[in-house]
Amino acid sequence: MALEMYDTVKSTEGRLLAVPKHGGSAEEIKSLTPVLSAYLYTSAGISVGNQTIKTALDTLEGLTMQRAEQTVALRSAVTTSVISKIYDRNGSSETFSVPTCVYIDLGSHDSEVVRVNEYGWSLLSDERKIASDSNQEYPAAPLFRRTATIRPLPVPVRSTNGRDHLASILGLTPTDPKFLLVWGWLVASVFVNIPRPALWLTGQQGSGKTTLGLLALSVVNPTERMGGNFGKNERDDLTLLSGS
């Protein structure tokens, strides 16, 4: 029954996930008990004990463990192209990857995703509608999963002064070095395939650090609380950042 509703995936981190066949974000297989219980009751009028469903899901996890690993993103994903470029007269070259598209999961109930590239941004739902109307293949997108801390982002709207407006909301000016640091951090935060800088906010108590931080975070990943404080040494800081 579960396989009629979901495809199963093993992520590169070893997570065993179920992906709705009609589209949507990946979920932990072990979290499907309430969904399957409700489905059985509404479709067949029967009530099955949790232990029975747990046994079935354990079996499904065992089968999924045998699958090849697949990349599953959290909030954002980056697709890249491999390029070889000639660097010297001897013809030696270096192969490197450059980002082609950034995908951002809005965390909404309809699984909306924003695709960003050098030409701008678009909603995947709009792209798929255009593809459907013209009988073309749907644009592919990375597979996303969500955690309990993932909160929805608003659907973006086009604006000619979005950067200036954000600076005003943060209580800064567009040319303020502080705003430029925040802006750079926001842009870097979605490039999950490379090391990214941390944003440390310092200042006296009551200077607005928490408010500024929460407002900045709300652009890419809304949350009710800030991250941790400085550690005792660099190793503590790196440990904290690696889990954020």
Where would I find each of the regions flagged by the language model?
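N-terminal nucleic-acid engagement/recognition segments and initiation subdomains in replication
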Residues: 1-157
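Charged/polar, solvent-exposed surface patches and flexible loops
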Residues: 38-42, 55-62, 164-168, 188, ...
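P-loop NTPase catalytic core of nucleic-acid-dependent motor ATPases
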Residues: 125-238
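Conserved P-loop NTPase "ATPase switch" module shared by AAA+ and STAND
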Residues: 242-244
